Each structure stands twice: as structure tokens, then as C-alpha cells.
Amino acid sequence: MTKFKFLTSVAFAATLMLGAAGFSTAASADDKITIIVGGYEKLIYLPAKLAERLGYYKEQGLDVELINEAAGVDAEDEMLAGNVQGVVGFYDHNIDLQSKGKFTVDVVQFLQAPGEVEMVSTKHPEIKGAADFKGHDLGVTGLGSSTNFLTQYLAVKNGVELGTFTSVAVGAGDTFIAAMEQDKIQAGMTTEPTITRLVKKGLATPLIDMRTVAATRAALGGTYPASSLYMTQEYINGHKETVQKLVNAYVKTMKYIHDHSAEEIAAQMPKDYMVGDPEGYVKALAAGKEMYTPDGLMPEDGPKTVLAVLSTFSKSVKGKTIDLSKTYTTEFVKAAK
């Protein structure tokens, strides 16, 4: 049993005992929500923590607990097991899961570009593009993660067969930087603020940049909606009012990001997220503001692009009939107050 599952079991048992003793709480059970975030210090997942810092969850009468999890694939496993109610992770997981007969739905879209960059070690100038991935170890947050999906796509698109390079799970932040420094990986996909830290240390330079919509279209052939809040269809069906409250909070957060400067947004965030470099954090946020959706809506051409990308290399998705309309909904965003 994992530490998380053990704590969840203890918490559940405690809840049962309190209920039996006749205790009550101010918030209803439906308004207590646990969400796993695939690394909430990352700028790509900033809206989840920003909503908390701005008081938008409480404003909706919600008691939201955010749990940090480095890799999205582990987060979705916890949700499917019923241990948490939602995941803040990449939209592409909904397509991947449907191909395996599991139905989850993106209810609000945070990013319209991945915010990811393939970084190449300064020790390996021979890697000039994805066509040079062959024979190298490439860093990803986790095997089965969105960074691994994108890495595999870029390789296959550029004529490099799966199996001729190795994806290495190195997480993000300090662990990613250490792997690059120790030459355990020669290139790897990561986000801010890790990108800025690598460049400042002279360890790596950007190879393929997907922090803007235009750059993403050039790399992937279309808009690639990335981080979002997704939940199981079963949970959504049974808790529509709670889901609407959550989406209300996130739509308000997206509008805050759109209407405020990087300095103003950074001032709301925990100082430790800036790993001792607040100036670099603000600079990275300013450069990446375009990746955030202004209103939480799914870009119209996004799902088709993601399906095309996954169909290129994924044995789970390739050849399967995927109903994209069941992988996301705009119902709650359009009704947001």
C-alpha cells in the first residue's frame, strides 16, 4: 500500500467514526474535494494553486485539498481507484484512457499549448533536432506521462523508431536537473521553472519549444491543449453542482491570469515555488502567459490534434475509434458565474 493510499484509508476510517459519533461539519461531503496536481509548483499547473491563494475555492463554498504528484499517470491511477475526485493534468490522458475503456472528462481547460520544452544537454551538441534522438537517453517526468507521449511523437515524426532511444523517468525540478548534470539523460522534456534553471546553470539549451501556440503548431501540427481538470464521468454525473463550483473558481482564475501582469500573479504564489530566483520566475511566467486559456474553454481544433499525435505512436490509441466528444465538455465553463 502506498503512503497516499494508507493516509486515505486512515482519513476515511476517521470520517466514519466521526459520523457515527454524531459530529457535523460546515461543508457538505460533496463540497470536500481532493485533487491531485502533477507538480503544482510548475507554471503549467499554476491555476490550481493560484485559485487557492486567491480564495476562489472558499468563495464557492468548497473545501479543496491539493495533493502533489510528479507524474500524471500515477495521479490518474489514484482517481480511477476512487481515492481522489479529480486530476489537474494534461488533456491527452482522457484520450489514452478511453482507448483502454476508461472514461474521464476534461471539465475546464487551463492551457492551449503544452508549455513544454525539449532541452538538450550542452555536453551533447550532436543532438541538433528530434531526428538525433536515436541512441540517447531522454528525460520525461514519468513513463506513461504526457512528456513521454510528446517525446515519442517527436521522435517518430522525425524518423526515429520507438525502441532506438530510451525514455528515462526523472521527474522535474531538482531531479531533472541532477539527471542532466550527471549525464543520465542527454536531452529531456520539462517546463518552467526547470527550463530557466537549466539555462542559468549552463547545463542545457532549448531544442524544441512548445510554450506558445504558434511554436506548438509548428512542432505538432496544431493546437495542443494541455493542462486541465479532469474527472471520471461517473463522478461528474453524480456531483454536477460541485463540479460547477470548481469550474466557477477556475474560470475566474483564468480571467485573473489574463487580466494581471506576471509580477502581480507571482506575488500571489508561494515563495518556495521560485526556488530562490523570483526574477527568473516572473520572467518565465511573462514569457509563457500566452499558453493559458483566457476563459477555460477547450480550443476547437485541440482535441483532433491531440488524437492525431497519440495515433502516431501509441499502441493503445492507434487504430481505435475514439469519441472525442466524450473526452471533454464545455458545459460547465459556459455556465460559469
Annotate each language-model stretch with its function:
Residues 29-170, 179-192, 203, 207-208, ...:
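Short, glycine-/small- and polar/acidic-enriched structural segments
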Residues 59, 131, 211-222, 290-299:
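Short, solvent-exposed loop/beta-turn-alpha elements that line the ligand-binding surface or hinge
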Residues 16-26:
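C-terminal segment of classical bacterial N-terminal signal peptides
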Residues 175-178, 182-270:
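Pocket-lining segment of extracytoplasmic ligand-binding domains
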Residues 236-316:
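Secondary-structure end/capping motifs
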Residues 1-12:
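Bacterial N-terminal signal peptides that target proteins for export
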Residues 304-337:
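Conserved C-terminal helix/tail region of periplasmic/extracytoplasmic solute-binding proteins
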Residues 51, 91, 149, 229-230, ...:
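A generic alpha-helix surface/boundary motif
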